[in-house]
Design a protein with these regions (language model features):
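N-terminal nicking endonuclease/strand-transfer module with a His-rich metal-binding environment
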Residues: 1-175
């Protein structure tokens, strides 16, 4: 199953279904944003930011269904820890106006059974991002109000085969 801006496709013979919401933004330090705070928000975890020495925690988030980090095979295993990953990202992006991460929010069509959400988002992240060397931190949220959705936080930099951050690509990724 592949999400795109317009729709996702089920490869088991189901007709393409429109994706009701798909938004991509950049987490920017110049706008007072933080990758650590974004990760804390979507995962519901309490995370300490080494950049501003503050704990980030959003205790009102009751709709978390699942949160997971997907790493390329050559990424350091320590990056499976959310605080370690996003603090490392914020350390390597050390300018006042750094772009820290890509944030994607997408809604699941109500026609799709809840049991398929995790499989769909894992396939999407693997094919579109992890296979290209990026790290994907995703969370599925569902309050039961008819708005099931996923948050994906992506590293801007990909990793090389030795687990080192590559320079920022001066090309558009095919998102």
């Amino acid at each position: 199953m592949i999400f795109t801006r317009e729709r996702f496709k089920c490869h088991q013979g189901v007709m393409p279904i429109p994706c009701p919401h798909f938004k991509i933004t950049i987490v920017k330090r110049s706008q007072g944003q933080s990758a650590v705070a974004g990760a804390a928000y979507q995962s519901g975890e309490r995370l300490f930011s080494e950049y501003d020495q503050k704990t980030k925690f959003y205790n009102k988030k009751k709709e978390l269904v699942h949160a997971e980090i997907m790493l390329p095979s050559h990424a350091p295993p320590g990056y499976a820890d959310r605080a370690t990953l996003w603090n490392a990202v914020e350390a390597v992006e050390n300018q006042w106006n750094s772009q820290l991460a890509r944030r994607i929010v997408l809604a699941f069509p109500v026609e799709v059974p809840k049991e398929q959400y995790l499989k769909m988002i894992r396939e999407f992240c693997q094919e579109q991002f992890v296979a290209k060397g990026m790290i994907a931190d995703f969370a599925i949220h569902d309050k039961g109000d008819g708005n099931p959705h996923a948050h994906i936080l992506l590293t801007i930099r990909a990793m090389d085969e030795h687990g080192k951050w590559l320079p920022k690509a001066r090309k558009d990724h095919d998102l």
